[in-house]
Amino acid sequence: MAQQTPLYEQHTLCGARMVDFHGWMMPLHYGSQIDEHHAVRGDAGMFDVSHMTIVDFHGSRIREFLRYLLANDVAKLTTPGKALYTGMLTASAGVIDDLIVYFLSEDYFRLVVNSATREKDLAWISEQAEPYGLEITVRDDLSLIAVQGPQAKAKAATLFTDAQRQAVEGMKPFFGVQAGDLFIATTGYTGEAGYEIVMPNEQAADFWRGLLDAGVKPCGLGARDTLRLEAGMNLYGQEMDEGVSPLAANMGWTIAWEPADRNFIGREALEMQREKGTEQLVGLVMTEKGVLRGGLPVRFTDSDGNQKEGIITSGTFSPTLGYSIALARVPAGIGDTAVVQIRNREMPVKVTKPGFVRNGKAIV
């Protein structure tokens, strides 16, 4: 039977259509996915993301361990609260998961990992951590609410204490701070400003209702997907998995190659892939009628006249732009145009960088 987050009852009270999402009953939408999408782009929306897994690490060798476990380098994290995005790789450089790691103190780091990969992530982390003598705690006692949009911070702040408002004042993106019972982070999955707020499970329902009273719109998985796709953000299982290199998933920027003597899991395989070349993740825009969908073939002719084919990993109609967009994994050599096979027709598409909307504005 699917699990329920501490906010399940609040979702039903808000009229949510609930679906099974990787073993969790989660809201798909609360009536209109499009309205929820526009609320985040134009005002403020909130998402229950309590199905995500929060893992706390304590011990004297955490930094050393995470420098080995992760492709990005936590040596960059020198200011308490600073976070970074990274892949966790297999020895053959496939992506086990993408995650966020927070540096809270020299003997305390926090990871937030995906729900779909929870069991394999925890098993992999435990296995790799064994020699390091760490205390690893899965925080199932905590809930997580993302508040996103141009008015999100202001509306969320109406629920904060004076001390909490002071703690987050001027906080830059990709930081987190423990302020009273709340862990407040300037992270998100929408391409908008906002907070991801962690709280004890027993406080989640009251906090949700407080956000409702502040005029924040509840949003489901449907809007979360169209928002992240407009922002060009990966979804595990679509843009990457254990069979896909981070270099083929627009995650090259998350790999810390320097210092050259840092040994991290997957490094040797990654270096070989970098030398040989990999596929790449691109954006696609189709202004003609129709919708780009995951699994559709993408065809193009490279500069040497060779016919090549890739595949759409995620596609949708963009509510912000008013036409269809997609992410696609394609062989090297693609130019600025291609065609996508939709049923019996080859539809022309424009090839872009992955990412279509930021802070409510088109960037394609």
From Swiss-Prot:
Gene Ontology molecular function: aminomethyltransferase activity; transaminase activity
One GO location term (cellular component): glycine cleavage complex
Taxonomic classification: Bacteria, Pseudomonadati, Pseudomonadota, Gammaproteobacteria, Enterobacterales
Protein name listed in UniProt: Aminomethyltransferase
Assigned protein family: Belongs to the GcvT family.
Keyword Transferase found: yes
A Pfam cross-reference name: GCV_T_C
Record-level GO BP terms: glycine decarboxylation via glycine cleavage system
Gene3D superfamilies linked to this entry: Aminomethyltransferase beta-barrel domains, Aminomethyltransferase fragment, Probable tRNA modification gtpase trme, domain 1
Function: The glycine cleavage system catalyzes the degradation of glycine.
Enzyme class at the top of the EC tree: transferase
UniProt EC number: 2.1.2.10
Keywords in alphabetical order: Aminotransferase, Transferase
Alphabetical list of HAMAP family matching this protein: GcvT
Quaternary structure and interacting proteins, as annotated: The glycine cleavage system is composed of four proteins: P, T, L and H.
Protein source organism: Klebsiella pneumoniae subsp. pneumoniae (strain ATCC 700721 / MGH 78578)
Transferase among keywords: yes
Annotated catalysed reactions: N(6)-[(R)-S(8)-aminomethyldihydrolipoyl]-L-lysyl-[protein] + (6S)-5,6,7,8-tetrahydrofolate = N(6)-[(R)-dihydrolipoyl]-L-lysyl-[protein] + (6R)-5,10-methylene-5,6,7,8-tetrahydrofolate + NH4(+)
